[in-house]
Regions:
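Surface-exposed, charge/polar-rich loops and edge strands
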Residues: 1-182
């Protein structure tokens, strides 16, 4: 399901905006903003809709005001899942006008908001004149690039094998020339 192109009518839900902390884009520090929307009707399916990169304020005492969807909007885009940080995957929410989180842990966010969110995030690609840029644009690799990377790794493995053999042969010759056993 991840990476799949989707189309849905996103209806804003009366829940706070989620701001993923410690994001950078074009040399600026800020947040990735998400809005909870319903994308299905029977049963209602809730999802996080990525709103884009929101530049942070000079002080961390307050959160930036985020422009959100205010009415149902037909959205096309891709589904993706944020990879978990192996050192810290906890949500660590800070409540305010929105919710500042350190990691996008959907299961903990479900508990915090008392809802059931889809395990993937919807990144729209059809929002015209939108206030925020989208820093991550998935670019699929062509088969030629995959083949190129495979050749590159194969050549690196071959060079490593060759260097290892040269070192072992030199060590063996040195040991034999000094009268010792290999």
């Amino acid at each position: 399901v991840i990476g799949v192109k989707v189309q849905a009518e996103a209806k804003p839900e009366p829940l706070p905006v989620v701001l993923l902390d410690n994001q950078t884009f074009q040399g600026k520090v800020g947040y990735l903003a998400y809005q909870v929307v319903s994308v299905g009707q029977d049963p209602i399916t809730l999802a996080l809709l990525e709103l884009g990169f929101v530049e942070g304020l000079r002080t961390r005492d307050s959160l930036p005001t985020v422009t959100t969807l205010t009415s149902p909007t037909n959205v096309t885009g891709r589904l993706y899942r944020k990879s978990m940080n192996p050192l810290s995957s906890e949500l660590m929410p800070e409540m305010g006008e929105g919710i500042r989180v350190q990691n996008l842990n959907i299961s903990e966010l479900n508990e915090l908001l008392n809802v059931e969110l889809m395990p993937a995030v919807l990144q729209p690609d059809n929002l015209e004149n939108w206030a925020y840029p989208f820093p991550w644009n998935p670019l699929p690799l062509t088969s030629a690039k995959h083949f190129g990377y495979a050749v590159q790794w194969f050549v690196m493995a071959g060079v490593f094998l060759l260097l290892t053999m040269v070192v072992c042969i030199r060590w063996f010759r040195k040991a034999v020339s000094q009268g010792g056993e290999a």
